[in-house]
């Protein structure tokens, strides 16, 4: 268990069988990281590029900043504090959402690499 400011996180570790993957030598995928387009990727096997939209992260951060400013102003007026439990919970929820987005994006890239038997990833 990992204690956080407002909750506990339980991490489960388990072993699984790793299957060998046949890859094509000299095959690669190139990733271009950005803001509006979080990842733009193209490989030399399918030559079909794909884009992972990054506007979701911008939206999460914009909403977080809006609520944070509101809660900070209320906390400063009412009890002259800069950080409260509500702000801690808000920060934790933002962290969870961004972590979930990153996990889904990396999973999509890995599935593409397995599907097209990619040997190298270039960032």
How should each PLM-predicted stretch be described?
Residues 1-123:
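Metal-dependent phosphodiester-processing active-site neighborhood
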């Amino acid at each position: 268990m990992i204690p956080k400011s407002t909750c506990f996180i339980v991490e489960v570790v388990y072993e699984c069988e790793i299957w060998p993957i046949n890859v094509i030598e000299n095959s690669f995928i190139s990733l271009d990281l950005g803001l509006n387009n979080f990842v733009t990727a193209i490989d030399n096997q399918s030559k079909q590029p794909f884009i992972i939209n990054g506007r979701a992260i911008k939206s999460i951060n914009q909403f977080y900043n809006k609520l944070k400013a509101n809660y900070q102003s209320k906390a400063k007026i009412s009890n002259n504090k800069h950080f409260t439990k509500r702000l801690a919970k808000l920060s934790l929820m933002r962290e969870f959402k961004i972590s979930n987005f990153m996990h889904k994006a990396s999973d999509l890239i890995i599935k593409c690499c397995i599907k097209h038997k990619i040997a190298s990833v270039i960032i």
